[in-house]
């Protein structure tokens, strides 16, 4: 990946204009890219540091197509996007990374977990919820996760006992065994269209348990070197299994055993 590029004439479109989009846009501008943001909120955070904003929703095919057509490459701040028009344009040769087909897969946490499981990635025991009775398959306590739409702790619930079934998620979901966690770990993985891949430093996440949102990130993670290498290997295997192109955050549980 040690290559030099001239980005001075390249145009990048980013779907999503929140804080992550802003960070991405700031770095892109320093590298010389022309940056356009698609977001429904006028003067959103990312637009404040970019060259242009297209005001439109993430499910608006016309605005999505406009962004792709006006830029050399299009990428994503978030996965909650209508992929229909993007898949069509990707098939026509437009540079959209990660692939909208991968974004569509990532949108469904159950399908994502199923694929990683089939590729030999270690995952907690899980089961699709087809009926209320399925919620009791693993006993209690158990984790229930919405298949789609979850973020920042939303779409995830801990069912401690059978009495909690009245609070269960009504949308399409799956259950997952409750893991005895020592640490929550994350690593950013970058992979290009040639398949070259590299990892950022492994970090440790501390969560605010009241709202289940990451509150503190410790870099580098307080772990042994041998464990760091294993985490990197698993993370790389995940992105290769997805045939991902772009920068991905891989989150892992370090169990007590």
Model regions: which residues?
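ATP-binding N-terminal substructure of ATP-dependent carboxylate-amine bond-forming enzymes
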Residues: 1-102, 106-107
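Structural detector of well-ordered beta-strand residues that form the stable sheet scaffold
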Residues: 36, 75, 96-97, 124, ...
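Short, hinge-like loop/turn segments at secondary-structure boundaries
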Residues: 52-56, 92-93, 114-117, 142-143, ...
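Structural motif corresponding to alpha-helix initiation and N-cap regions
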Residues: 57-61, 83, 131-132, 162, ...
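A conserved helix-loop-beta module that forms one wall/lid of the active-site cleft
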Residues: 98-155, 162
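Internal nucleotide-binding/catalytic subdomain
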Residues: 155-256
């Amino acid at each position: 990946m040690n290559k030099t590029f001239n980005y001075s004439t390249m145009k990048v479109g980013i779907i999503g204009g929140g804080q992550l989009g802003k960070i991405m846009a700031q770095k892109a501008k320093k590298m010389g890219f022309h940056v356009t943001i698609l977001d429904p909120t006028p003067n959103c955070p990312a637009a404040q540091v970019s060259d242009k904003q297209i005001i439109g929703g993430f499910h608006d095919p016309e605005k999505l197509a406009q962004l792709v057509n006006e830029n050399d490459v299009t990428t994503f701040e978030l996965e909650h996007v209508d992929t229909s028009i993007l898949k069509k344009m990707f098939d026509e040769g437009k540079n959209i990374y990660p692939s909208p087909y991968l974004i569509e897969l990532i949108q469904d946490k159950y399908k994502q977990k199923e694929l990683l499981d089939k590729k030999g990635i270690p995952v907690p025991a899980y089961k699709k919820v087809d009926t209320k009775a399925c919620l009791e398959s693993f006993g209690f306590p158990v984790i229930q996760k919405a298949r789609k739409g979850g973020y920042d702790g939303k779409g995830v619930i801990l069912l401690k006992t059978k009495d909690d079934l009245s609070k269960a998620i009504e949308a399409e979901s799956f259950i997952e065994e409750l893991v005895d966690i020592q640490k929550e770990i994350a690593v950013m993985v970058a992979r290009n269209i040639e398949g070259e891949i590299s990892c950022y430093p492994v970090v440790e996440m501390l969560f605010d348990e009241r709202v289940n949102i990451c509150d503190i990130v410790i870099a580098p993670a307080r772990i042994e070197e041998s464990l760091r290498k294993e985490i990197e290997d698993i993370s790389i295997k995940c992105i290769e299994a997805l045939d991902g192109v772009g920068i991905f955050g891989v989150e892992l549980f370090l169990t007590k055993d």
